[in-house]
C-alpha cells in the first residue's frame, strides 16, 4: 500500500438503546429526587446509584445520622429506608442511547411518564434534581407533576462532579430538604457533614 493511503476508518456502531429503572416512590414521598439516567454500574446492578464512588447514599446518611443506612448488599432495605424518610427516586429519562455513563453522551432520550407517577405520590411537595442534566428538564417535569411544585437544583452526587467537596454537597442537600421537614440536620450552619 502506498504511503498516505489507508483503509477508510470503520464507523463505530451506534450506541444501543438503553432502558432506565422504575421509580422508587410511594404515598409517603414528599420530595422526588430525579437523576438524569442510570450509569452503567446502576443498569448492570438494576439499582439506583450503584457506582461505588457515587456519593448519593453517603450524602443521605449524613442527613439522617440517627438512622443507619442499610449496607450496599441490601438494596431493598436501602429503598425502604429512603421511602421512610419521605424521599422517592427516579430519573428524567425513561430510555436513551448512550456510550458509557456520562450525561454529555446521552442521545435520543425519551422522558419518563410523570403523569402516572403523580397518582402514586399524593403528598409530593417538591422535585429535587440531582445535577444539571436533570434540571434542564425541570419545566417539562413540573408541567406534568404540577406547576406549583418547587424544582430544587442540587449538586450532582456523581463522581464526575469532583469540583464539589463531599461536605459542600451534604450542606447543599440539607439546606434544600430541610424546609420539607425531611432531615435530622438543619443545614450549613450546623455543618452536617463536616
Question: What are these model-derived regions, one by one?
Answer:
Residues 37-38, 93-96, 155-158:
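Short, histidine-centered active-site or binding-site loop motifs used for metal coordination
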Residues 84-134:
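Internal catalytic-core helix/loop-beta-alpha segment
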Residues 60, 137-138:
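Hydrophobic packing residues within well-ordered alpha-helices of enzyme cores
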Residues 41-105:
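Short, surface-exposed acidic-centric catalytic microdomains
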Residues 37, 41, 133:
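Gly/Ser/Thr-rich beta-alpha loop segments that engage phosphate groups in nucleotides
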Residues 32-36:
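N-terminal nucleotide-binding beta1-loop-alpha1 segment
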Residues 1-30, 51-52, 100-115, 139-194:
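C-terminal capping/extension of enzyme domains
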Residues 64-65, 121, 142-145:
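A broad structural signal for alpha-helix termini and local helix breaks/kinks
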